[in-house]
Amino acid sequence: MEKLGFHKVSNSPSSPSQPKITHNRPIPHPQSPPLPQRPLSEPLKKQLLVDNSPGNDVVIANCVAVNAQDFQNIPDRAPVILDGVFVYSIAKDDRVRPGTIGLAGNMRTWGKWSLGQPVNVENYNIFHNGQQQQYLGAIDLSIDFRAKARANSNPINHDELVALFLKNYENQILQPTQVIYMEYTGIYFQIRVNNVQIIDVNTKDQLPSFKDSDDINTKGILIKSTDVGFYPYEGSIINLTKPKTLKQRMFGGSTPHRTSRRKQIINPDFKLEDLGIGGLDAEFQDIFRRAFNSRILPPELAEKLDYKHCKGLLLYGPPGTGKTLIARKLSKMLNGKEPKIVNGPEMLSKYVGASEENIRNLFKDAEAEYKLKGEDSDLHVIIFDELDSVFKQRGSGKSDGTGVGDNVVNQLLSKMDGVDQLNNILVIGMTNRLDLIDTALLRPGRFEIQIEISLPDEKGRKDIFLIHTKKLTENGILSSDVNFDELSTLTKNFTGAEIEGLCNSAKSYAISRHTKKGALAQIDPESIAKMKITRDDFLLALNDIRPAFGTDEEDLSQQAQHGIIQFNQTIRNIFEKGQSIIDVVRSSETEHLRSILLYGPPGVGKTSIATTLALNSDFPFIKMLSAETLVGMGELRKIQEIDNVFRDVHKSPLNVLVIDKIENIINYNPIGPRFSNDILQVLMVYLTKKPPKGRRLLIIGTTSQYQVFKHMNLIDSFNDAIAVPPIKHIEEVGKVLDKLGFMNKSEREEILSQLSRYDINIGIKSLIDVLMVSKYSRDTVDEVVNNIVEKMSG
């Protein structure tokens, strides 16, 4: 048997990651434990030289060995304090030379003493000044094999360890960070005191209170009623059985609080502002409340609440909103195992069964630790990016026919919520398409928490600007004229990634101002030292970065190149009614979806009115769906594109969708007649589908086939149907000519005079087309009139 005092012992003060195991031992009244002997002796103060402990019997007794000649007036097993900090009981032993003190390796490591080093020794009275707060109500201990070669995972009876510990060290004074060697069944174990709970019986109502401490200066006497809890060192394979019953330490009618010894799930040094993510305060509150609150509870309380830990967290939303960034930051915040980060397609393999094996391998470490340590195991985080690429709806027929996609979904389901459930995992998934994921994965027990990471609002955009310009501000490079309130207003529907790109573009403009004239790749060193990034740099950058979910004003404005000519009261009424509907969508507490159908013959300006209303709404997201965007697509592909468009217009707080020439979108042909019923049904469903909570949508449709749509019941899907009339009066033609400044006044009057002989019926778009062609052809008045008449008759 090795002699423990003669070997260097590595002190492992790292805190275990596992919760404590409490001992089921009743606690009597605090005044009942017997007091240890208080020897009445002369004050002792000696300086002795450190030597090895004389034998293992002294080591496992947790005593320091001294020669009787040096302690003639001090009884055996009396407590002494070394260097004013470390308290031990003495064991008089003739094997120790006078003037020396025998310290085992674990003692020398704890006190940082070397052999031959002098140490100050004084007798110690824990009850000085009449204090009665020196009994241990509870003690938490880490345990591991002393010799790694003897380590094994055979079950070790926890209750027997507790009984042996109390028998060996009763009435000894113990303190946090102390390391003790104890022998059990012929094997030596290393035990570390992590936390003690001191009983205070000096309260006014004579009921005890309990004070937890992990401070080395906190000392207490181990008594028979002390609650002893063992748990493994971090990384140890020791296998402790659980106590037969959980201890209900009732003391005077109250239950003392015991701090759980499980490693804190949240890194104690973490601060929320360290995440570096702006505009997601509400989302983070939801994540912490639903995913992590249960894991920071003491295990005993969680068991009483029968709280099931969250195993899956799904982040979904448009690209660039920070889903992947959030997952990375959360994994750094968590104080568990190193997270496993995988992309969905990486799980797939061309070999039979390999895809399913890849899924199993992700959970292998968590399974092994959970089998060994149960609820005491660390949290294992698995991060899936592009979840929709692998875990599609089963039976959808979108796989290669091998059924691999279905099997991968089944494998993930069994690992997250199967027969052998794991309680030490958290799977974080990310996707742009929540609708593609198998619905079984979204039920409780799987990805039960689904957080939408949407486009940031104005406050969120300002936060993101502040994050990406923090170093510029700290280093004095950001000009004082930069107004983030202004920039956050100008960047409607920008994602976090797009705002970052905007900041980088502004920096590039600032750098370009400090390049040498005539040289693109040479920096002026004198000028660059004074560089400032100004407001103008950000405004220029706005021309470079366009939001994916923004308004394409150039394309929309081209639909009304000559502006809107309100040639009669009906047109003015259309704009007034349209504006009132816009105000309803913007401000109403109940009407979050409104739809308008503008109908009339071809060429009356329906598209121009629709796009102008959309642009005048000043909504942050305006989208146009027309037959032009669907050219070359088959019917199924068109349906998918329409589905994508409607999903996009649900992502911003305020949205406008212009559906132009609906008859062309549904492939309507009057010969037959023919149309796509599938596309029609999709449109009818989406026209009445309410947007998600917190989102508002205005739909403006146009058609030249009102009667046809009435028979198809499509008109009923719109809230309002507004007729757009053609020009029918000669005065209206005159207003158009005047607005366009066509020819001179006398020529305009001549045109009107000649047209007065005809019945006027022409769309304003058709009229403007004729006038523009005539203008650049330098037609005469008679030719202009003939062109207009031909257009009306054609």
UniProtKB/Swiss-Prot annotation:
GO molecular function term, any single one: ATP hydrolysis activity
Function: Required for vesicle-mediated transport. Catalyzes the fusion of transport vesicles within the Golgi cisternae. Is also required for transport from the endoplasmic reticulum to the Golgi stack. Seems to function as a fusion protein required for the delivery of cargo proteins to all compartments of the Golgi stack independent of vesicle origin.
Biased composition (Polar residues): 9-21
Species of origin: Candida albicans (Yeast)
UniProt: ATP binding residues: 317-324, 600-607
Subcellular location field: Cytoplasm
InterPro entries according to UniProt: AAA+_ATPase (IPR003593), AAA_lid_3 (IPR041569), Asp_de-COase-like_dom_sf (IPR009010), ATPase_AAA_core (IPR003959), ATPase_AAA_CS (IPR003960), Cdc48_dom2 (IPR004201), CDC48_domain_2-like_sf (IPR029067), CDC4_N-term_subdom (IPR003338)
Listed GO biological process terms: autophagosome assembly; endoplasmic reticulum to Golgi vesicle-mediated transport; Golgi to plasma membrane protein transport; inter-Golgi cisterna vesicle-mediated transport; SNARE complex disassembly; vacuole fusion, non-autophagic; vesicle fusion with Golgi apparatus
Name of the protein in its database record: Vesicular-fusion protein SEC18
Source organism, top-level taxon: Eukaryota
Keyword ATP-binding set for record: yes
Entry-linked CDD domains: AAA (cd00009)
